[in-house]
Amino acid sequence: MSSQRPPRPLDDVRVLELGAFLAGPFCGQLLADFGAEVIKVEPPGKGDPMREWGRHRYKGRTLWWPVLARNKKSITIDLRTPEGQALVKRLVPHVDMVLENFRPGTLEEWGLGWEELHALNPGLIMIRVSGFGQTGPYRDKAGFGSIGEAMGGIRAITGFPDRPPTRIGISIGDSLAATFAALGALVALHQRQRSGQGQVVDIGIYEGVLALMESMIPEYQLTGHIRERTGNILPNVAPSNIYPTADGSWFVIGANADTIFTRLAQAMGQPELATDPRFATHQARGEHQAELDDLIAAWTLNYTADQLQVMMDEYGVPAGRIYTAKEMLSDPHFIARQSIIGVHDPDLGEIKMQNVVPRLSATPGGVDWTGPALGQHNREIFTDLLGLTEDDLAMLQAKRVI
């Protein structure tokens, strides 16, 4: 922990991150945000592929890595070599958690499976994120986030009914699995305080998606209903949609409760809508959803998004324009709550990124540094933690183990 910052709740937790891409490393980011010392293991010479992922470059660097690897320490180990595997085994007694997202069985092939590592550290918590989990007939299949999204149910219900299933604009499957993995890690850590024993946290990417599918399963089981794509509406819940504006943007209005709809009707200058039999109750509005949406859209087209926001705020109607990064960086509420912060990067200068979520009143998380250079912390970890000598490091480097 840096002596120049306040303490964080996970300052006494050390994590060895063996994963790559997103599903494992985002879990590591969440833990590091709250103070965990996350030691990220990367292949020598090339590092995590996420170092090269991203839509745009600035000063020759992609911009995903500085966010995903923030607060982490980078060391290099070739896990495919006996010497590299031996280094991991030497590190395991010094850590609380091992985080990995290889295909099931890979670490076992390298002699780094649960049985081997647990024997070295009985209190170890091993966080295992994979496409389909560590058990079951699909455990050995390759499974990226897109496959988990498809099989977990979210692709089938995303988009419009007359078009093919649509991808959400972010890697939601990987991120959900990572978030649940972080939750599982903290639950296991709490249990270890009681028992002194570690355990495996096992999540398949598809399960992280499935967990958010609301009542989709019992709806089919008990009624035979299969949810379909519905575009931007909530079926039978109205009004809740996006509406066009006079300045060519889109505006979200959610006024599906009776009292809120009454206020919306007043804001529209059409208070009679609240007593119209077609719209007077939640059920009636649901039955006349398209008709109601058309009425609201015809009204919103007369105003800019800013004008609509003023009116909706005045009448207490939940509403807002659809933001891009441009609006987020200038919004006074984002600024007041420091939802986006600036972090110094030695190569990029100040880089803006999302702040730590959630907020803790007494021991909040924070961001101390952006994603590190490849192997930046080799000497710190290998010499200070493991006691290797300069000769040891030179030999391992010569063999390309680190």
From Swiss-Prot:
The source's superkingdom equals: Bacteria
Return the protein name. Succinyl-CoA--D-citramalate CoA-transferase
Q: Which GO terms describe its molecular function?
A: CoA-transferase activity; succinyl-CoA:(R)-citramalate CoA-transferase activity
The UniProt keywords, alphabetically, are: Transferase
Q: What is its EC number?
A: 2.8.3.20
Which reactions is this enzyme annotated as catalysing? (3R)-citramalate + succinyl-CoA = (3R)-citramalyl-CoA + succinate; (R)-malate + succinyl-CoA = (R)-malyl-CoA + succinate
Could you say which protein family the record assigns here? Answer: Belongs to the CoA-transferase III family.
GO terms, biological process: carbon fixation by 3-hydroxypropionate cycle
Q: What class of enzyme is it?
A: transferase
Q: Which Gene3D superfamilies match?
A: Crotonobetainyl-coa:carnitine coa-transferase, domain 1, formyl-coa transferase, domain 3
Q: What role does this protein play? A: Involved in the 3-hydroxypropionate cycle used for autotrophic carbon dioxide fixation, and in the glyoxylate assimilation cycle used to regenerate acetyl-CoA and produce pyruvate as universal precursor for biosynthesis. Catalyzes the transfer of CoA moiety from succinyl-CoA to D-citramalate to yield citramalyl-CoA.
- Which species is this record about? Chloroflexus aurantiacus (strain ATCC 29366 / DSM 635 / J-10-fl)
Q: What stretch or stretches form a coiled coil here?
A: none
